[in-house]
């Protein structure tokens, strides 16, 4: 049996607010990271404020499965990923991922983390659909999500403004049966 929380490049671990909050504060000082990740205007928060927010979030969000992303090679904390179950009866969830350490951008770590969380979503939580949204200008993320099996399901035109221009938000999703078919093909390659 495979370790549910380990991929080819990363492993998911529990959230440690004390550790992750200082990394979050540093990552969120990177305006490019912030603008690729979030609808909100870029702003700065202290590690203390982030830690307090994380602790409240972890306590109150019983339908959220939130993990740190660590490299297998040296156990380096490089990002986080969360899966928010939006409807248990229909098996729906929303996923978000952020690789905060720039040295790991564009090298497959985010895609690997997404593959791990999808395995968890479909094999452990028995979900039917996982969805996400992404800004159209985040082409690297769109390619990563497509590699993980997500398909474009819709767009909200001119939803976000960045640098004086309006951009679309793309909505992508993957169904359990689509993932299972691809997972079976990957499993037989081993």
List each model region and its residues.
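Conserved catalytic-core motifs of GNAT/GCN5-like acyltransferases
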Residues: 131-134, 151-168
């Amino acid at each position: 049996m495979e370790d549910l929380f380990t991929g080819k490049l990363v492993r998911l671990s529990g959230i440690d607010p004390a550790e992750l909050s200082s990394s979050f504060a540093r990552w969120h000082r990177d305006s490019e990271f912030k603008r690729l990740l979030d609808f909100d205007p870029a702003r700065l928060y202290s590690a203390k404020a982030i830690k307090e927010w994380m602790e409240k979030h972890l306590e109150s969000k019983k339908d959220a499965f939130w993990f740190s992303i660590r490299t297998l090679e040296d156990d380096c904390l490089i990002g986080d990923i969360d899966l928010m179950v939006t409807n248990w009866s229909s098996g729906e969830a929303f996923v978000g991922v952020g690789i905060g350490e720039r040295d790991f951008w564009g090298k497959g770590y985010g895609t690997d983390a997404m593959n791990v969380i999808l395995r968890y979503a479909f094999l452990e939580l028995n979900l039917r659909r996982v969805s996400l949204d992404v800004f159209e200008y985040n082409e690297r993320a769109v390619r990563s999500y497509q590699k993980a099996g997500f398909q474009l399901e819709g767009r909200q035109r001119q939803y976000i403004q960045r640098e004086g221009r309006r951009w679309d938000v793309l909505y992508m999703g993957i169904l359990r049966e689509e993932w299972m078919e691809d997972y079976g093909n990957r499993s037989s390659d081993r």
